[in-house]
Regions:
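Short cationic amphipathic helices and targeting signals
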Residues: 99-103, 161-164, 171, 241
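An internal, amphipathic alpha-helical element
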Residues: 206-275, 286
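Internal, conserved structured core segments that host functional sites
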Residues: 147-214
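Long hydrophobic alpha-helical segments typical of transmembrane helices together
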Residues: 256-304, 308-318
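Intrinsically disordered, low-complexity regions enriched in glycine and serine
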Residues: 3-10, 72-77, 302-315
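An N-terminal structural lobe/cap that precedes and organizes the functional/catalytic core
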Residues: 43-144
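N-terminal mitochondrial targeting presequence
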Residues: 1-51, 318
Length: 318
């Protein structure tokens, strides 16, 4: 579970920096679809929505992991399956779409329960619950939109950050070549890809065989894995880096470094803007660490307990 611990630490540190600012999150802290989902989930219990600060009244005292009474869930292509749930004051948590929130591993359920339990005494900040946002999106949005998500991910390929370089010989090009070499080596060894690298401003079209192999790899992902890759690819501007990181080939800190490589080089040259670049860094840390942590918890098994311990709450949904 080393990968999960590293991702959790990175996400927690970034969230503390964002929460310390107060008020609403900066633009891009979470995909709009996920942020709306988290608000809808908490707001349904109160019959309202988040206020202008992006917060909700806290309407529960205890969040805990429970054995889900509806069992393993329905069969279906890519449908998340699990036997664990999260209860708020013994009321089962449901998605914004009123679907049961089933977790494939106890570890993931415990992490989501912790996100709820560690909210403030008076208010809930949905933007500080990246795992909850990802899980809700996977359950409500992904099953009916898998084809569109895969197509959207493939749109990254021709201009993938791992494949588009600055002019040869420049410091940026050297940093890109050194940084992305392990990602491309992994893509060759694990996926059988031979992607083209280019310094053209508009990227370069990739071969049909490369596109076909990547499409097949994406279609094999379950809904939770797919939503993790989707958010991570957006944060990194790289499908290849997102796949490598969610497969454990690139650590969370290295993934974050590569995701911000160009921006950090610009900061080195021109200086950092307080209240701008520092917030961008925290935003990127959450968007990178959250998906990696999600996949690590999926693959790391069911170790770990829920916040407040495992309970017997199996009542109505929130």
């Amino acid at each position: 579970m080393a990968a999960a611990a590293a991702a959790a630490a990175a996400a927690a540190a970034a969230l503390r920096r964002l929460a310390a600012r107060g008020g609403a999150p900066p633009p891009g802290i979470a995909p709009g679809r996920a942020r709306a989902g988290a608000r809808g989930l908490a707001g349904a219990r109160q019959g309202g929505t988040a206020d202008s600060s992006g917060t909700l009244p806290r309407f529960y005292r205890r969040a805990e992991v429970v054995a889900h009474p509806e069992g393993a869930g329905p069969d279906g292509a890519g449908a998340p399956r699990g036997t664990w749930g999260v209860a708020l004051d013994q009321k089962l948590l449901r998605s914004p779409g009123k679907l049961p929130l089933r977790f494939p591993t106890r570890a993931l359920a415990a992490a989501v329960a912790a996100e709820w339990q560690l909210q403030g005494e008076q208010n809930v900040r949905p933007f500080t619950m990246p795992l909850m946002q990802l899980v809700a999106t996977a359950i409500d949005r992904v099953p009916a939109a898998r084809g569109g998500i895969v197509t959207g991910l493939m749109d990254y390929l021709d201009t993938d950050a791992a494949l588009c370089r600055e002019l040869a010989g420049t410091p940026a090009a050297v940093a890109q070549e050194e940084g992305f070499a392990p990602v491309l080596a992994w893509a060759r060894a694990e996926l059988g890809l031979r992607p083209r690298v280019s310094d053209a401003l508009t990227g370069t079209p990739q071969e049909a065989g490369t596109r076909d192999r990547l499409t097949e790899a994406l279609c094999r992902l379950d809904d939770l894995e797919l939503v993790a890759v989707d958010q991570l690819a957006g944060a990194c501007r790289s499908l290849l880096l997102a796949l490598a990181a969610t497969r454990g080939a690139v650590g969370v800190q290295e993934c974050l470094r590569l995701a911000r490589l160009e921006e950090e080089l610009q900061i080195e040259e021109w200086g950092m803007v307080e209240g701008g670049h520092d917030i961008d860094r925290a935003d990127a840390a959450v968007r990178v660490a959250g998906p990696i942590l999600l996949v690590a918890l999926l693959r790391g098994g069911g170790a770990g307990g829920g916040t407040g311990g495992e309970g017997g709450g199996r009542g109505d949904s929130t």
